[in-house]
């Protein structure tokens, strides 16, 4: 059954391999949770604060983050399938070694975000602030940064395979 949590004060969460499914979190503050290796399926986070969360190695399927704060979150080594980030603040978030399929980033503030060694398939960036974002050793083929701010973006060498097929 679906669970809805609205503006619920949550205690510090420290659990590994936690399963969350068919849930909506609205206006919740998660005080720097540690949920490494957890699984999220059919979950919506709306106006939630997940700043400084450690969600490394997590799996996200059909998850929406709407107007959330993920500042400084460790999201490395995650698997992201059919996920939407809409108008989120994600400065200094770390997505290193992530695998992304069918993911959309829209209208987000993503300054200094790390996307090192990521794999992208059907990923879209729309109206994002990617100032100083890092994409080293990440193939950017098929991506479009046409309507996003990419000042100071860091990638591999200008002649490297990483830039082939990128639209700016």
Locate the predicted segments by residue.
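Tandem repeat scaffolds
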Residues: 1-168
């Amino acid at each position: 059954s679906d669970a809805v949590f609205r503006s619920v004060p949550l205690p510090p969460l420290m659990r590994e391999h936690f399963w969350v499914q068919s849930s909506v979190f609205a206006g919740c503050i998660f005080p720097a949770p540690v949920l490494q290796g957890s699984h999220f399926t059919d979950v919506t986070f709306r106006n939630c604060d997940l700043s400084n969360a450690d969600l490394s190695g997590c799996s996200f399927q059909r998850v929406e983050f709407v107007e959330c704060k993920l500042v400084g979150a460790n999201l490395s080594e995650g698997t992201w399938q059919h996920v939407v980030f809409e108008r989120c603040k994600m400065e200094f978030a770390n997505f290193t070694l992530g695998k992304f399929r069918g993911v959309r980033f829209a209208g987000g503030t993503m300054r200094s975000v790390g996307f090192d060694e990521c794999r992208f398939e059907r990923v879209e960036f729309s109206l994002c602030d990617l100032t100083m974002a890092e994409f080293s050793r990440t193939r950017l083929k098929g991506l479009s940064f046409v309507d996003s701010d990419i000042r100071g973006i860091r990638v591999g060498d200008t002649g490297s395979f990483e830039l082939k097929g990128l639209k700016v």
